[in-house]
């Protein structure tokens, strides 16, 4: 099964690269690289903005990182039940709703319905305990209705398939990227991802 997944992923990657006609440049001299780097500096200066990547909505964090940059790998770490998923979903909401950016979420623990309920409570400022017990107050309904409209328009794509491998996630993210130009991919959470030791050994062999 690992070999099949690997072959499918490699074939999909090849097709994707052909479709985009993206050819590697190989070695490039500094005389060609430096002008591009300087041009980027000029563009960043002209923007007059501190956030050059994907803003999270957390001001201090955004100022420290200038936003999540393309190819960044960000890991949220903490003890169990400390709010890692809630923090990640707040970042997802900000990126999709405020920044208008397509976001992919691979949820290996919670179902997509559970995540949607969490986000509705967050956006609508409704106590999640009242949602769970069904003891909603009259003032909660307009807030939930407003939150439903906002969340429905957000370009958030959730996959709660259990046991997704790294190869499967990469293939799905690649397809979504080609269709919606993804700006952020979130995985909740890493320890639940199955590890293909055959695939790891193949990478070790290539590295050696």
Tell me what each language-model feature is.
Residues 198-207:
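Conserved small/polar residues in nucleotide/adenosyl-binding loops
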Residues 79:
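P-loop (Walker A) phosphate-binding loop of NTP-binding proteins
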Residues 1-47, 51, 82, 101, ...:
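Short, small/acidic-rich helices and loops at N termini and domain boundaries
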Residues 59-67:
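Pre-Walker A adenine-sensing motif
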Residues 70-74:
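Pre-Walker A (Motif I) flank of P-loop NTPase domains
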Residues 87:
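Hydrophobic positions on the alpha1 helix immediately C-terminal to the Walker A/P-loop
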Residues 63, 90, 94-181, 195:
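Cytosolic-facing regulatory segments adjacent to core modules
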């Amino acid at each position: 099964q690992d070999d099949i997944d690997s072959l499918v992923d490699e074939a999909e990657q090849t097709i994707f690269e052909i479709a985009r006609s993206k050819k590697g440049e190989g070695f490039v001299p500094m005389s060609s690289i430096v002008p591009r780097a300087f041009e980027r500096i000029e563009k960043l200066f002209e923007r007059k903005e501190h956030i050059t990547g994907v803003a999270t909505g957390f001001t201090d964090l955004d100022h420290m990182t200038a936003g999540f940059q393309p190819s960044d790998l960000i890991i949220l770490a903490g003890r169990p039940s400390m709010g890692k998923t809630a923090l990640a979903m707040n970042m997802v909401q900000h990126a999709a709703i405020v920044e208008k950016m397509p976001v992919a979420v691979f949820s290996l623990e919670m179902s997509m319905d559970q995540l949607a309920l969490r986000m509705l409570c967050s956006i609508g400022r409704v106590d999640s305990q009242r949602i769970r017990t069904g003891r909603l107050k009259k003032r909660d309904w307009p807030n939930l209705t407003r939150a439903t409209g906002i969340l429905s328009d957000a370009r958030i794509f959730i996959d709660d398939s259990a046991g997704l491998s790294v190869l499967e996630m990469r293939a799905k993210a690649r397809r979504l990227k080609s269709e919606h130009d993804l700006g952020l991919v979130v995985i909740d959470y890493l320890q639940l991802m199955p590890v293909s030791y055959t695939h790891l050994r193949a990478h070790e062999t290539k590295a050696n």
